[in-house]
Amino acid sequence: MAKGILGTKLGMTQIFNEAGEVVPVTVVAVEGNVVLQLKTVDTDGYEAVQLGFGDIKESRQNKPSKGHAAKANATPKRFIKEVRTSVEGYEIGQEIKADIFAAGELVDVTGTSKGKGFQGAIKRHGQSRGPMAHGSRYHRRPGSMGPVAPNRVFKGKLLPGQMGGERKTIQNLEVVKVDVERGLLLVKGAIPGARKSNVIIKSAVKGN
């Protein structure tokens, strides 16, 4: 059965495994997940568990958010997402902790990648630059726009533009360690987003 939890990326570090090898890990804080709503086939046409994470400060709360959270006896949450899974074993108001996952499990992590602003074709797409000798006037431009005949640039041409700031999912990352007391998950490798950004951790679609 698919599982999921919401969290905040704290940053990266490294730990040693049993073989004495260094393993790079990302630390994700997951303490404070609450089941706000259960979606069922009868009422919504599909099954899902709605999770809330991160409290909204009092001055930012509105009546709809207070009313929705009150049904779960919780405070309004800043980050609310659904996990498509069976609702069996879940109750409204239930707290989801880090031990929903175990060390060795594979997960998919979704987050918003770091925004890089407007970037050129070399940085954005990894293209090669032109000759840098003084005889050349072609250095970091995007290259040919295509053939003359269509009188237009084809869709998909790799050009300068906004880089980063997109929703990205990294698949099949291993859960290296689960710290229930401190509400932390240590995931092998890097995950999308800047420090203190919100992420969604779900059971791997392809791996498990």
Swiss-Prot record:
InterPro entries: Ribosomal_uL3 (IPR000597), Ribosomal_uL3_bac/org-type (IPR019927), Ribosomal_uL3_CS (IPR019926), Transl_B-barrel_sf (IPR009000)
Subunit structure: Part of the 50S ribosomal subunit. Forms a cluster with proteins L14 and L19.
PROSITE patterns registered for this protein in UniProt: RIBOSOMAL_L3 (PS00474)
Record protein name field: Large ribosomal subunit protein uL3
Gene Ontology biological process terms in this record: translation
Keyword terms: Ribonucleoprotein, Ribosomal protein, RNA-binding, rRNA-binding
Organism of this sequence: Exiguobacterium sp. (strain ATCC BAA-1283 / AT1b)
Superkingdom of the organism of origin: Bacteria
UniProt-annotated stretches for the region Disordered: 117-149
Molecular function (Gene Ontology), one example: rRNA binding
HAMAP family, sorted: Ribosomal_uL3_B
Positions of transmembrane segments: none
Entry GO CC: cytosolic large ribosomal subunit
Family in the record: Belongs to the universal ribosomal protein uL3 family.
Function: One of the primary rRNA binding proteins, it binds directly near the 3'-end of the 23S rRNA, where it nucleates assembly of the 50S subunit.
